[in-house]
């Protein structure tokens, strides 16, 4: 029996073409729909679910993908989502925190549009189909497949503006590799809390620390509209003392604040006890989020709030 794979196209560079001037533009005719399938034992059913550049993707679109996957899961052995690379990691992480069905779910994209020299779209697409048809992938969580590598949605991030090997997993490395004749996995995804949301809303912005920062950015926030805040802190988890003092206002109003490091590698933890240091911030109620970058920590908090987590449950989830 062939493996039936549902493909959900959402737009992005993988669906685009370069015009005569070299500018990459959207196309109503997705070139991936014209790719002949040379893979034996794989039957593809493709849908043009969205046609959006990924900076236009919102949480509501991610939720729609989740709902479509749940709706169709019994009819397919795996799912491939083609997606723009700018926010691909956020969609992948969102899906990875949902109660997705126990089938392989793989996201892929391209760094070069379909008619550019060295286009990587078709190769990544076929690689994603191979992984989605592999039963072993069902136990790995939501996956990102690009450039012969398999990455866990939780950890992968876009690291280069144009390079085809842009998707990397800092600290941990890839989950597996795609070889000519086989797929090699050398890591497993850890168990995680999953949610079944039917709506997602809320305002959780990201603020990055910088030298000389005081309290001006916090003052600009409309606290009546704010549901939570992500701080991208220095080093192990430190911010200027003026900013730390202003965060107290948010915390006293019951607005959750979560912290990650702005460093590319490593994990934020409370180490320093000076004003604005991580020890003081944790004592004041700031959540220290492990192993996630700011954009994923934002989704972690947004999802937790929409799931109704509060108090100690929210703290345990955010810091777990």
Q: Which residues fall in each region the model found?
A:
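ATP/NTP phosphate-donor binding region
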Residues: 1-70, 245, 265, 288
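Accessory alpha-helical/coil subdomains and C-terminal extensions
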Residues: 2, 8-12, 28-38, 152-231, ...
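Short beta-strand segments
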Residues: 8-10, 81-83, 106-109, 143-147, ...
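A glycine- and small-aliphatic-rich helix-loop capping segment at beta-alpha/alpha-beta transitions
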Residues: 21-29, 93-105, 121-127, 158-164, ...
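Short acidic, glycine-rich surface-loop motifs adjacent to enzyme active sites
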Residues: 74-88, 224-236
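Short Gly/Thr/Asp-enriched flexible loops that form oxyanion-binding sites at enzyme active sites
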Residues: 84-103, 239-248
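Internal gly/pro-rich beta-alpha loop/helix module
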Residues: 107-178
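ATP/nucleoside-binding phosphotransfer catalytic cores, i.e., glycine-rich phosphate-binding loops
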Residues: 241-320
